[in-house]
Amino acid sequence: MRGKTHCTIGILSTIQACILFKIPISIFNLVLAAIFSILPDLDESNSTISNVFLKQDASKLILKIVIYIINFAIFFISLKINNNNFFLSSIVTFIAIMVLEYKINHILLRKILLSLTLILLSLCLFFIKVKIYFVIFFLMLASFPWLKHRSFSHSIFAIIVIYFLLKQIEIIYNISNLSFFGTIGYASHLFLGDLFTKSGIPLFYPISNKKYSLGYFRVGSFFNNALEILIVVILVGSIIFSTIKI
């Protein structure tokens, strides 16, 4: 399911929850749900949430710069080792370019940069003595880019961990309903989103790798896009009905 659809569903689910549980709707709750509704896709390097942390154009530029710097370094080191033999050093550098471009690709670099960003954020929080649950939360997110797409981050266990960490932060900092709306947003990604795609999600990972699916259409296909619209329409209808009923 597309990122914008996940975001929309997360926001609508939050509005519905606010109506059902008679909780005032706030911008904070909606933004929180929107962010958490796309968090599971941090395990996909080109997802909406990954692009929030690091734009693809930026990572492609960084990749070029890194490769150029390494190649220049290899060339000059080779010159020194080979007694300023320009021809031999050029051959060594050319081979190095071929190997580097094969081994260091855009996706790998994005994973590294995304993880480093979240790890650095965790370290900053640790050194300014923010409560450990914040640090653990961002360290967990730092592991997501290295996970197989739709594995741990798309499981019930991940929802439980997210709820637990947010609940501790909520209690410590007295942030009303943080765990409730964060978990709703995250869970909506799974149960109102990817569960309805053909590839499904491993709900009981890591206990079982079996993927569960209530859909028959590939993400991005006409029918899957139509299904996404239908889910959004149903949620909007549910909100209107709940409002009228109240």
Regions found by a protein language model. Give the residues of each.
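N-terminal membrane-targeting hydrophobic helices
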Residues: 1-188, 192-246
